[in-house]
């Protein structure tokens, strides 16, 4: 295996492992986040299931963590055997999976960020109050969880780029370079 291939595999492996860690951390932080307030003798509990965008984030991060863990195992096995991906159909499958994971998680982050801004700032035109004024601990832990999910999403975008490079270099290697005018 060439040095550049080894470095690419190592980078991909580190990114995939970080995706698994950050996505799992986000999942744990968000799912375990609750806060109870007593409002006029009525107990009100804030939990992640109250906002559907956050439920979407939890599901997306769960899928991403498992997918990245499985792909990490594939990277380790490929590195140990010293093989680089040469199959175009398999490269397309990995590329498509990586793209789907990246888009899914970026969409989940965007939806959750919008819900978070509304919870923090409220919406005066619709008379929605600021929820984070009442549930400060809940909002702070949720923000940390969403930040972890954002880091996982950024790593997914980079993995997607590596996957695209791995796929499209399979097509560039078969061209006869002597016939190009450049």
Curated annotation (Swiss-Prot):
<keyword id="KW-1003">Cell membrane</keyword>
<comment type="subunit">
    <text>Homodimer and heterodimers.</text>
</comment>
<dbReference type="InterPro" id="IPR006459">
    <property type="entry name" value="CASP/CASPL"/>
</dbReference>
<dbReference type="GO" id="GO:0005886">
    <property type="term" value="C:plasma membrane"/>
</dbReference>
<feature type="transmembrane region" description="Helical">
    <location>
        <begin position="13"/>
        <end position="31"/>
    </location>
</feature>
<feature type="transmembrane region" description="Helical">
    <location>
        <begin position="142"/>
        <end position="162"/>
    </location>
</feature>
<feature type="topological domain" description="Cytoplasmic">
    <location>
        <begin position="163"/>
        <end position="182"/>
    </location>
</feature>
<dbReference type="Pfam" id="PF04535">
    <property type="entry name" value="CASP_dom"/>
</dbReference>
<feature type="topological domain" description="Cytoplasmic">
    <location>
        <begin position="74"/>
        <end position="89"/>
    </location>
</feature>
<comment type="similarity">
    <text>Belongs to the Casparian strip membrane proteins (CASP) family.</text>
</comment>
<feature type="topological domain" description="Extracellular">
    <location>
        <begin position="32"/>
        <end position="52"/>
    </location>
</feature>
<dbReference type="InterPro" id="IPR006702">
    <property type="entry name" value="CASP_dom"/>
</dbReference>
<keyword id="KW-0812">Transmembrane</keyword>
<feature type="transmembrane region" description="Helical">
    <location>
        <begin position="90"/>
        <end position="110"/>
    </location>
</feature>
<feature type="transmembrane region" description="Helical">
    <location>
        <begin position="53"/>
        <end position="73"/>
    </location>
</feature>
<feature type="topological domain" description="Extracellular">
    <location>
        <begin position="111"/>
        <end position="141"/>
    </location>
</feature>
<keyword id="KW-0472">Membrane</keyword>
<protein>
    <recommendedName>
        <fullName>CASP-like protein 2B1</fullName>
    </recommendedName>
</protein>
<keyword id="KW-1133">Transmembrane helix</keyword>
<feature type="topological domain" description="Cytoplasmic">
    <location>
        <begin position="1"/>
        <end position="12"/>
    </location>
</feature>
């Amino acid at each position: 295996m060439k040095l550049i291939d080894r470095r690419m595999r190592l980078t991909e492996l580190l990114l995939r492992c970080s995706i698994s860690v950050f996505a799992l951390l986000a999942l744990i932080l968000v799912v375990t986040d609750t806060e109870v307030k007593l409002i006029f003798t009525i107990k009100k509990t804030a939990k992640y299931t109250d906002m559907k965008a956050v439920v979407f984030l939890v599901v997306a991060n769960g899928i991403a963590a498992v997918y990245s863990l499985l792909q990490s195992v594939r990277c380790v096995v490929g590195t140990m055997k010293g093989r680089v991906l040469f199959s175009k159909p398999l490269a397309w499958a990995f590329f498509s999976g990586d793209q789907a994971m990246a888009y899914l998680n970026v969409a989940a982050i965007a939806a959750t960020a919008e819900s978070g801004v509304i919870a923090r700032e409220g919406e005066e035109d619709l008379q929605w109050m600021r929820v984070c004024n009442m549930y400060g601990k809940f909002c702070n832990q949720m923000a940390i969880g969403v930040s972890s999910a954002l880091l996982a999403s950024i790593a997914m975008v980079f993995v997607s780029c590596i996957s695209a490079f791995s796929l499209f270099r399979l097509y560039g290697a078969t061209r006869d370079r002597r016939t190009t005018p450049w």
